[in-house]
């Protein structure tokens, strides 16, 4: 599960951001526009719209076309503490003139795409949030070609919930599809090896939409971090879209001795280690009957002595046969993860021009700030990947990987080197000096510095680099657009007998602690901030970049977001993702200053911005109804990022 820790960012948002109002390339033909039928625009998650009504020349004229309010501000959760965890990360999908999306409480809403008027609403009745922020990124659509257009549940909306259910709803009415699972509700809690046996499954839920391919609805999961080595299993499962019966399941950690990967694990670890789940959105290549899985870190996150080896297939990009669940190929992006460097983004399935030939590819953006690119049929890297030596000073009992994979191209989009005293930054000489003193005190050997008993600077931090917003890809100009963060974390391992004392000590106020049961060490971490709540390293702390994927070169990179009374374009922490359009624009919100922006895709110049009524920690989408192009964003804030909360879905369009 991704984590933007609330420890420190509340101070950061209150001090750092006080928001005011605010050619000559080989071309690949773009697919015909079908609106926005998938979370990522299409099954491959390219976040590209072929619509071009809105252009760099007229984008400044965009106005609010309609606003819808969900009414969900955590009222379904008991107590104000739970409400503060609400996020609104949804991206609507379009089908038959209707937008479908989930709220932060995983209620499902359908609105008229032209007017924003409510068509129907289904209340999921989630009564409790058990860990992390309440996040729900959206829904999936399936149209049953064996039924007529007017039949009940001819088109189905699949919506995951925060209490591990999968709902199948009639797209026309919002009623449960009675022939799916248990009268329209599928219980996802089976065969997961829950670590808590008290009757409530507190650390397993689904935050991203499933993907539907070949009549199967494929579902990942989100699992709580830093708790216990014997955590819930990260099994990916496919269910029949019509009746909800299990078709196949695939566990990224090999449990069966006959699995070729089993020999890379000890018997004890293969039996007990959990996680390596797929909490980001999944992607599909229906023509090749493939589903692409981004797997995350195994348990426990910051100590791996109980799981020696590379730990495949954790921290990997995986291609499975969509009909059988059999592994087609996999590539591990982090060996023996000790940094919570989940494979965090939806794999983007694109067609690249490489050495003059069109190649079916998959691009994976990572928390490390690197883009990995593979032939999606074979798994072979399109740009070479080399294994480089990494620091080897682990704690007693740890078994480190001697090397880690680095793509030759594109170059990293974020800082990866050691944090040095000269990197200290502050808004005053006083806090800059405090940061410089901390840097001298802490360990920092660059990316993949192993966690230790002495406080260590993790750069990039566990929030990225890139995050779940993934990339947006312009197929005509071969440009991948991605937002990133330069936001180091600091952390340390804690001997078990000292954990409680540190948790209770005022010296560590503001730190996040994890027990990491079943290992010799607990952990603590937080964002590396000055006493004033400002990042201790030089800006930009948030950036937007375009990468030419034909050459692997960075075309442009600009700060993303304003800070300190909106006078400094420093680039700020951000959660969300971009989209690109055939009109030559990039749209993105995501930032802590609550603005949505449009950029020229060729230059990175900002052309338009609008101050949202709440944080826009979501990914926009675009579609057309009645010859009018709309851009839609959810604005509801993010609990961990500390942005303003709300319940808005806002559509922008040019004046009629």
Residue ranges and their predicted role:
Residues 17-20:
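C-terminal motif of bacterial Sec signal peptides marking the signal peptidase cleavage site
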Residues 22-24:
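Bacterial signal peptide processing site
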Residues 28-75, 94, 545-547:
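Mature N-terminal segment immediately following signal peptide/propeptide cleavage
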Residues 36-40, 84-107, 132-165, 202-228, ...:
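Repeat-blade elements of multi-bladed beta-propeller folds
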Residues 169, 174, 232-246, 310-325, ...:
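Beta-propeller blade signature
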Residues 295, 351, 532-553, 557-563, ...:
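Loop/turn-rich, solvent-exposed surfaces of beta-rich toroidal or solenoidal domains
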Residues 346-395, 651-654:
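Phosphate/diphosphate-binding loops
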């Amino acid at each position: 599960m991704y984590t933007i820790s609330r420890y420190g960012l509340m101070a950061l948002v209150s001090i750092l951001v006080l928001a005011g109002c605010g050619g000559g390339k080989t071309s690949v033909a773009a697919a015909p526009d079908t609106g926005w039928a998938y979370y990522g625009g299409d099954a491959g998650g390219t976040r590209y719209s072929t619509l071009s009504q809105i252009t760099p020349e007229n984008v400044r004229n965009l106005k609010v076309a309609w606003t819808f309010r969900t009414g969900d501000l955590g009222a379904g959760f008991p107590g104000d503490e739970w409400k503060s965890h609400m996020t609104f990360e949804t991206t609507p999908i379009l089908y038959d003139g209707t937008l479908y999306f989930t709220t932060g409480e995983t209620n499902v809403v359908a609105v008229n795409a032209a007017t924003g008027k409510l068509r129907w609403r289904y209340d999921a009745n989630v009564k409790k949030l058990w860990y992390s922020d309440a996040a729900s990124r959206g829904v999936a659509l399936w149209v049953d070609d064996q039924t007529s257009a007017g039949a009940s549940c001819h088109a189905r909306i699949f919506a995951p919930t925060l209490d591990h259910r999968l709902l199948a709803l009639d797209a026309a009415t919002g009623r449960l599809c009675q022939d799916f699972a248990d009268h329209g509700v599928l219980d996802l809690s089976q065969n997961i090896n829950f670590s808590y046996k008290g009757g409530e499954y507190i650390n397993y839920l689904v935050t991203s939409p499933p993907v539907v391919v070949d009549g199967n609805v494929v579902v990942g999961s989100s699992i709580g971090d830093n708790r216990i080595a014997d955590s819930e299993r990260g099994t990916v499962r496919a269910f029949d879209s019509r009746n909800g019966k299990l078709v196949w399941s695939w566990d990224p950690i090999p449990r069966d001795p006959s699995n070729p990967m089993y020999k890379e694990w000890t018997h004890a670890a293969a039996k007990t280690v959990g996680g390596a789940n797929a909490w980001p959105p999944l992607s599909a290549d229906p023509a090749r009957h493939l589903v692409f899985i981004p797997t995350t870190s195994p348990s426990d996150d910051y100590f791996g002595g109980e799981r020696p080896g590379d730990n495949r297939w954790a921290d990997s990009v995986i291609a499975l046969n969509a009909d059988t669940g059999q592994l087609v190929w996999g590539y591990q992006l982090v060996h023996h993860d000790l940094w919570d460097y989940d494979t965090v983004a939806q794999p983007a399935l694109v067609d690249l021009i490489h050495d003059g030939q069109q190649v079916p590819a998959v691009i994976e953006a990572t928390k490390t700030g690197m883009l990995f690119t593979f032939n999606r049929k074979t798994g072979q890297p399109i740009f070479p990947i080399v294994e480089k030596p990494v620091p080897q000073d682990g704690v007693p009992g740890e078994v480190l990987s001697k090397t880690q994979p680095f793509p030759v191209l594109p170059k990293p989009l974020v800082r990866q080197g050691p944090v040095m005293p000269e990197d200290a930054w502050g808004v005053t000489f006083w806090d800059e000096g405090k940061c410089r003193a901390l840097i001298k005190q802490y360990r920092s050997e660059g990316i993949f510095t192993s966690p230790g008993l002495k406080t260590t600077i993790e750069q990039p931090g566990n929030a990225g680099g890139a995050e779940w917003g993934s990339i947006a890809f312009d197929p005509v100009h071969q440009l991948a657009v991605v937002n990133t963060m330069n936001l180091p974390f600091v952390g340390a391992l804690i001997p078990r007998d000292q954990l409680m004392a540190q948790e209770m000590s005022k010296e560590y106020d503001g730190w996040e602690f994890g027990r990491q049961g079943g290992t010799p060490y607990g952990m603590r971490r937080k964002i590396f901030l000055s006493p004033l709540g400002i990042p201790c390293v030089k800006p930009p702390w948030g950036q937007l970049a375009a990468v030419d994927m034909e050459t692997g070169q960075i075309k442009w990179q600009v700060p993303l977001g304003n800070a300190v009374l909106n006078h400094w374009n420093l680039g700020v922490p951000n959660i969300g993702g971009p989209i690109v359009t055939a009109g030559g624009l990039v749209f993105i919100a995501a930032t802590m200053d609550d603005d949505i922006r449009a950029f020229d895709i060729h230059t990175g110049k900002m052309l338009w911005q609008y101050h949202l009524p709440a944080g826009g920690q979501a990914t926009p989408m675009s579609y057309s109804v009645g010859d009018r192009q709309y851009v839609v964003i959810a604005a509801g804030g993010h609990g961990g990022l500390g942005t303003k909360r709300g319940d808005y879905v806002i559509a922008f369009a040019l004046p009629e």
